[in-house]
Design a protein with these regions (language model features):
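Intrinsic-disorder-associated, low-complexity terminal segments enriched in Asp/Asn/His/Tyr and depleted
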Residues: 7-10, 20
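Conserved glycine-rich acetyl-CoA-binding loop
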Residues: 86, 108-125, 132-134, 138-139, ...
């Protein structure tokens, strides 16, 4: 028997416990329209955890319609779903319509209890594979210096910090040239 403890950071109010096979099971799959609300909860919850504010008018407008901003142009958007059907992670790949070589990794977030399980690396690999399949040769991403674990993941996969403009809540820009 497992005991649940309330956790406001986790949609549904429950924290997954390793002793509960349904709570600790997961899979990565493509975004579905019915995921939209849960995706926003994950993204905005993680932003709040790091003291960062959502920007519904600019940086986060893409979450108003994931299909239009990511899927229709040929990009991708993935979610991590736990064994109970709850969304616990997100990752998007936006294709730059003005530069056929360039794309952006966006909205890569995992709820706290799901970090450190290799899921970030799996999400990143899914996005990079998709970028390659579309013929893109450069992946860029913006992040915030407070997200040290994410930065470590990006650097371990070959991303390097570059100069350039970032959105208001981000202060670091990285790029990876695909082979």
């Amino acid at each position: 028997m497992s005991i649940r403890r309330p956790d406001p950071r986790y949609p549904g109010g429950e924290t997954p416990l390793d002793e509960d096979p349904l709570a600790s099971a997961f899979w990565i799959r493509g975004f579905r329209r019915e995921d939209a609300s849960a995706v926003r909860e994950v993204v905005f919850g993680v932003l709040a955890e790091f003291g960062l504010a959502p920007d519904h008018a600019d940086t986060d407008v893409d979450l108003s319609d994931v299909e239009i901003h990511y899927l229709v142009p040929g990009g991708g958007f993935w979610v991590v779903e736990d064994g109970r059907g709850r969304i616990v992670g997100t990752c998007g790949l936006w294709l730059d319509p003005d530069d056929p070589a360039r794309c952006e990794l966006r909205k890569m977030y995992l709820l706290p209890d799901w970090r450190g399980r290799g899921l970030g690396g799996q999400l990143l690999e899914a996005a990079l594979a998709h970028a390659r399949s579309t013929g893109r040769t450069r992946v860029e991403l913006e992040t915030n210096r407070a997200m040290t674990a994410a930065i470590g993941l990006y650097e371990s996969r070959g991303f390097r910090e570059i100069e350039g403009e970032t959105c208001a809540r981000c202060d670091r820009l990285f790029a990876l040239d695909l082979k």
